[in-house]
């Protein structure tokens, strides 16, 4: 299917410019950003990334942005990884059973950034509309679920019309990648794909699409061929679950 290539997630139907432009104030760091130096963009007990750019934090990960004082430093802030884009050589290829997929053309270390799952950030009504319009085709919409106290917040990212190489990663019940919720200086997050173990040259990249909300034998068969394969691909009860 034809789609427009983009490098990072952009606002789409159902997401207002006011919401998209709801940005954080930014840090006032005068040296390298870190927990030790009390960078305000780091909200956990550890730095977001190691010195060599591998992910350390696992929740509420906020990268520094153009609103931060560290932008004026003569060296690159190490709290900027996802926004710097894809650094690894990746290739789209045709699989024998699963359509297109993505493979690594160079080694990827555990916890290294692979790519963003870039697409349009859309509202729930637009998710439902697109599912109806494209009901005979595969559903690409990724739902990010976050919990703040008792409140659940969902963010919908759809690369169907505008996206990047991340849309071609297939599901595996024993994946070598995983998705993290990352904020690039604004409240609305994006989805970043990181390696969850060492990945060899020529290995297909995959992540777990999630827990299925539907049981039964009418679901699409999983073809990951892993030892712990769950037999069927995950399916949601509704488009916005």
UniProtKB/Swiss-Prot annotation:
InterPro entries: H3K9_Histone-Lys_N-MTase, Post-SET_dom, Pre-SET_dom, SET_dom, SET_dom_sf. The keyword Transmembrane helix does not apply. Zn(2+) 3 binds at residues 33, 64, 70, 77. Residues 25-85 form the Pre-SET domain. GO terms for molecular function: double-stranded DNA binding; histone methyltransferase activity; zinc ion binding. GO terms for biological process: methylation. It is found in: Nucleus; Chromosome. SUPFAM superfamilies: SET domain (SSF82199). GO terms for cellular component: chromosome; nucleus. Zn(2+) 1 binds at residues 27, 29, 33, 39. Zn(2+) 4 binds at residues 173, 222, 224, 229. Zn(2+) 2 binds at residues 27, 41, 64, 68. It catalyses: L-lysyl-[histone] + S-adenosyl-L-methionine = N(6)-methyl-L-lysyl-[histone] + S-adenosyl-L-homocysteine + H(+). Keywords: Chromatin regulator, Chromosome, Metal-binding, Methyltransferase, Nucleus, S-adenosyl-L-methionine, Transferase, Zinc. Residues 88-210 form the SET domain. SMART domains: SET. The keyword DNA damage does not apply. Probable histone methyltransferase required for embryonic development. This is Probable histone-lysine N-methyltransferase set-23.
């Amino acid at each position: 299917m034809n789609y427009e290539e983009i490098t990072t997630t952009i606002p789409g139907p159902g997401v207002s410019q006011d919401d998209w432009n709801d940005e954080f104030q930014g840090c006032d760091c005068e040296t390298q950003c870190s927990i030790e130096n009390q960078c305000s963009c780091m909200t956990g007990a550890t730095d977001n990334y190691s010195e060599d750019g591998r992910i350390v934090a696992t929740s509420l990960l906020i990268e520094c942005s153009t609103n931060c004082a560290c932008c004026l430093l003569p060296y690159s802030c190490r709290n900027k990884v996802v926004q710097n884009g894809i650094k690894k050589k990746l290739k789209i290829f045709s699989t024998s059973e699963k359509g297109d997929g993505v493979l690594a053309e160079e080694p990827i270390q555990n916890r290294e950034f692979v790519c963003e799952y870039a697409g349009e950030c859309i509202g729930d009504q637009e998710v439902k509309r697109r599912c109806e319009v494209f009901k005979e085709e595969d559903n690409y919409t990724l739902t990010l679920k976050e919990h703040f106290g008792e409140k659940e917040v969902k963010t919908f990212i759809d690369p169907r019309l505008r996206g990047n190489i991340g849309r071609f990663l297939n599901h595996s019940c024993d994946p070598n990648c995983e998705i993290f919720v990352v904020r690039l200086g604004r409240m609305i997050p994006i989805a970043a794909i990181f390696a969850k173990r060492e990945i060899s040259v020529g290995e297909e990249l995959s992540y777990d699409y999630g827990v299925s909300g539907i049981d039964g034998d009418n679901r699409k068969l999983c073809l990951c061929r892993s030892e712990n394969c769950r037999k069927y691909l995950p399916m949601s009860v509704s488009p916005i679950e």
